[in-house]
């Protein structure tokens, strides 16, 4: 089987959003730009694969350093035995980063190896993962951090011009009127709205009852229905997610 002959870290930066947007002010102190980090794996058959790790958006040089640390662990080994390669990387990183930074990088290696293997075999990646369950996955526009109506209208204009019919906004449990207004404005354009409640960043996260109350309040003020709810409660609350599933149709 093809061996891993080369591993490269790729960092790409570019303009992102507007300097006055709330997301930039809150999350990007270096200004309106954003970096993505990728692992490029080259097999000895000449095929390359790419995988992205989200860590690089906020800490690109940390991402690069962990790639450098991981590189010797998999060089020269079978690039098709992806499960074993991930295990090699975990044996190096789990002691000090069972979750968090190293997991982002290991994920990038995992994706890159799947990409390279699929290209080598001449099949789409989903065939390596058991085949497709649906013929396609609709895309959505991720935004909704706006603090003005004009900001929302601008994002909706962009989505409409691209033919994108799904829109994700950020909102918290007190944003009932704001959420209903956005859903009505989007609905005029045939666009459905999903809501990211950002509870992965909350300590402590909100309760299930808060989420249900918010959904019911929003739905009482619009004829449209939320497409989905994301990060509704904290990531370490599996029982809460089960309860939420039982209490809402969203």
Report the location of each language-model feature.
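Active-site mouth loops of central-metabolism enzymes
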Residues: 136-151, 170-172, 201-208
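N-terminal small/glycine-rich loop or linker at the start of catalytic domains
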Residues: 96, 121-145
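Catalytic core of soluble alpha/beta enzymes
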Residues: 169, 176-250
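Metal- or metallocofactor-binding catalytic centers and their adjacent structured scaffolds
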Residues: 42-120
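Short, acidic/polar
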Residues: 147-159, 207-216
């Amino acid at each position: 089987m093809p061996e891993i002959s080369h591993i490269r870290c790729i960092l790409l930066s570019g303009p992102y959003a507007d300097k006055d947007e709330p997301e930039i002010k809150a999350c990007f102190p270096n200004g309106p730009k954003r970096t993505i980090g990728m692992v490029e794996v080259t097999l000895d058959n000449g095929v390359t694969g790419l995988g992205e790790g989200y860590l690089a958006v906020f800490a690109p040089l940390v991402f690069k350093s962990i790639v450098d640390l991981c590189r010797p662990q998999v060089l020269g080994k079978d690039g098709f035995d992806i499960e074993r390669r991930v295990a090699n990387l975990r044996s190096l990183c789990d002691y000090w980063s069972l979750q968090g930074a190293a997991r982002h990088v290991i994920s990038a290696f995992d994706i890159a190896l799947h990409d390279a293997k699929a290209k080598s075999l001449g099949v789409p990646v989903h065939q390596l993962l058991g085949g497709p369950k649906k013929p396609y996955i609709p895309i959505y526009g991720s935004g909704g951090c706006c603090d003005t109506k004009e900001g929302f209208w601008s994002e909706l204009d962009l989505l409409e011009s691209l033919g994108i019919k799904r829109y994700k906004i950020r909102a918290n449990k007190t944003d009932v009127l704001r959420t209903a207004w956005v859903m009505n404005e989007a609905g005029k354009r045939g666009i459905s709205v999903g809501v990211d409640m950002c509870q992965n960043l909350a300590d402590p996260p909100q309760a299930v009852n808060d989420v249900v109350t918010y959904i019911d309040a929003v739905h009482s003020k619009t004829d449209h229905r939320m497409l989905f709810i994301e990060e509704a409660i904290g990531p370490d609350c599996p029982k809460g997610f089960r309860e939420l599933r039982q209490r809402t149709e969203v």
